[in-house]
């Protein structure tokens, strides 16, 4: 009898072990199958309790450091419609949710108001509001108007379907602006035929904390409040004191930089189509930057246009993908940049022999040039419809030169399309973060570099920490095993004493 009982116990124990192993195998296979299908078809579960995107700790950290301590008069977030209308609209409810989270975090500072602009047109005009979907951020007499579109990012070529939510950054930037009325000014030069495809670069500089203004450097001196001077897509040269003009813009620029000024110069392969800009090119050579030209068979000076069919998002190879240098200060500055870096219709920057290589940088006296963005090694230069040059190292697309004796900075970008709406506001590109990081490296403080947009296709669990997610996974595996084990013990005990 003892032998028979022992065999039964062994048999039942074996069944229990087999069931336990079987359940473990099923759980593992189910987990692997669901994971594979989720990755293949983009399945995800939004774990946010409100089914919306919560404000991140990074954003709260920015507000704690740069906004809340200065908001003595309080911050008002004004939605320009009735509350029920805002909540009923799915898109606007995203924005309202973010505002409510901020108001809950800072109840003594941030207040939410609802204003029907159709019933109160006078108040709407005072703020400059033109649509009921606008949102006003105000502090005392200072205010900023955000359009509904400002809170979202859109993919290239699609202005209707947003790809990411940009709410916390838009609110943080607007709040920073209204509590900092003495913000530095970024002046855009306008007397060299400059033209902008859109306002994306200005919006990016506003995000960085600048006010925007324009400057005719031929008629006026560079103002004392100029925190940044920008020349974007010029069609003509800067003037120098010669027989043609008694006013030298070059001298004004030099005097500005001698006092620690910051200068950004954006050009493209089309900039020098009618020939070089002798004055500004000669001056920039002193800062380590020259632009490559080629003289054609008929003696016509032609500007290099960079092409790389292996690293391009267009078939012609002229819409380049840039890369961060692997050495030098540029690699350190841009170490945290992710996303695709796009530079189209770019010309070639060449560093003159007066600058000596030094661990990835180039040095001349008190000035150091750091490449920030380069092409891949396979890129080549074309001019006049023919290939004219190729280098094993690739070409520099963006450079930053700094003078340690004056703290002046000169950033040169060889692609105007690096700073247009499609790249600065399009989802998936890292151009905006790159630009903000460059401004920070130039000395601009309080730049919201760490504030990120939140993609709608994001499968990140925003609420759970990694440790919490791991504990839940362990529990989901262990609980079925524990249940089967307990059940098996109960069966064995009942049979033992039956």
Predicted regions and their residues:
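Short, surface-exposed patches at the edges or C-terminal ends of soluble domains, predominantly
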Residues: 2-498
């Amino acid at each position: 009898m003892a032998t028979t009982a022992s065999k039964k116990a062994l048999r039942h124990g074996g069944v229990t072990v087999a069931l336990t192993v079987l359940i473990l195998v099923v759980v593992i296979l189910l987990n692997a199958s669901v994971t594979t299908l989720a990755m293949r078809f983009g399945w995800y579960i939004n774990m946010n309790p409100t089914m919306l995107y919560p404000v991140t700790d990074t954003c709260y950290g920015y507000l704690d450091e740069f906004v809340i301590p200065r908001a003595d008069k309080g911050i008002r977030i004004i939605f320009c419609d009735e509350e029920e209308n805002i909540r009923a609209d799915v898109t606007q409810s995203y924005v309202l949710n973010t505002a409510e989270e901020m108001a809950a975090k800072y109840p003594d500072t941030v207040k939410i108001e609802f204003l029907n602009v159709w019933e109160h047109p006078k108040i709407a005009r005072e703020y400059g509001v033109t649509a009921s979907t606008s949102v006003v951020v105000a502090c005392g007499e200072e205010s900023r108007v955000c359009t509904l579109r400002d809170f979202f990012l859109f993919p290239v070529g699609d202005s209707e379907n947003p790809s990411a939510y940009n709410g916390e950054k838009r609110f943080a930037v607007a709040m920073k602006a209204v509590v900092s009325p003495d913000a530095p000014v970024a002046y855009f030069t306008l007397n060299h035929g400059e033209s902008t495809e859109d306002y994306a670069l200005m919006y990016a500089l506003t995000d960085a904390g600048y006010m925007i203004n324009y400057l005719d450097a031929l008629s006026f001196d560079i103002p004392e409040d100029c925190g940044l001077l920008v020349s974007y897509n010029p069609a003509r040269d800067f003037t120098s004191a010669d027989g043609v003009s008694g006013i030298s813009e070059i001298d004004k620029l030099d005097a500005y930089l001698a006092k620690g000024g910051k200068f950004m110069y954006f050009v493209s392969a089309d900039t020098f189509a009618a020939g070089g800009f002798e004055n500004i090119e000669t001056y920039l050579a002193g800062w380590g930057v020259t632009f490559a030209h080629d003289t054609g068979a008929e003696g016509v000076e032609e500007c290099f246009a960079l092409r790389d069919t292996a690293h391009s998002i267009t078939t012609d190879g002229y819409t380049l993908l840039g890369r961060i240098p692997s050495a030098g200060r540029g690699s350190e500055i841009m170490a945290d940049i992710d996303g695709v870096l796009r530079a189209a219709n770019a010309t070639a920057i060449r560093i003159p022999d007066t600058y000596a290589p030094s661990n990835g940088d180039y040095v001349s006296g008190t000035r150091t040039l750091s490449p920030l963005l380069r092409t891949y090694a396979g890129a080549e230069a074309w001019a006049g419809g023919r290939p004219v040059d190729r280098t094993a190292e690739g070409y520099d697309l963006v450079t930053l030169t700094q003078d340690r004796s004056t703290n002046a900075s000169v950033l040169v970008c060889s692609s105007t399309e690096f700073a247009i709406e499609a790249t600065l506001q399009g989802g998936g590109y890292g151009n905006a973060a790159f630009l903000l990081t460059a401004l920070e490296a130039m000395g601009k403080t309080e730049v919201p570099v760490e504030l990120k947009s939140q993609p709608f296709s994001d499968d990140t669990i925003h609420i759970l920490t990694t440790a919490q997610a791991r504990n839940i996974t362990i529990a989901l595996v262990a609980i079925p095993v524990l249940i089967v084990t307990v059940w098996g013990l109960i069966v064995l005990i009942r049979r033992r004493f039956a």
